A protein has these predicted regions:
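Structural core segment of the AMP-binding/adenylate-forming
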Residues: 75-142
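Conserved hydrophobic/aromatic "anchor" residues
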Residues: 29-31, 70
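Conserved AMP-binding/adenylate-forming
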Residues: 43-87
């Protein structure tokens, strides 16, 4: 059973039970919200041309948003790629060259910095996660 299946199961059993809590921000999300919001992120990814099998770099802080995005990536059958945001430029470039991801999800600052990093610059689909989350709210679940 995949984690995404377990989330759907828990959404049915206890939709209003807290699924995640971000200790730093006190942000909480229920199983129902997690399933629905991650489905909307899937719709956003599909509109951006991302599909099953694509490799996506996740370059955002760990928190509720991170897990929503990761859940959407897994639901779509894409591959999540994690790169240490504190790594040096050479390491980041090498990771991107080795993996050849189709997309990157990061902050606006990360996307901007990416124009100066060869490895990130080569990634075709650059997604600002804050804007994505805002826009995804208005989309239908997949």
């Amino acid at each position: 059973m995949m984690i995404t299946d377990k989330i759907k199961e828990l959404k049915e059993k206890c939709p209003y039970k807290t699924a995640l809590v971000d200790i730093k921000t006190k942000n909480k999300i229920t199983f129902s919200q997690m399933d629905i919001r991650s489905d909307k992120i899937c719709t956003y990814f599909e509109k951006k041309g991302l599909k099953k099998g694509d490799k996506i770099v996740i370059f955002i802080p760990i928190g509720v948003e991170f897990y929503l995005i990761l859940t959407a990536i897994l639901k779509m059958g894409m591959q999540a790629v994690f790169i240490d945001p504190y790594a040096d430029t050479e390491y980041i470039n090498k990771c991107c060259e080795t993996v050849s991801p189709e997309g990157i999800v990061g902050s606006g600052k990360t996307i901007l910095k990416g124009f100066f990093l060869k490895g990130i610059r080569k990634i075709r689909k650059k997604i600002n996660y804050v804007k994505m989350l805002e826009q995804a709210e208005g989309l239908p679940p997949m």
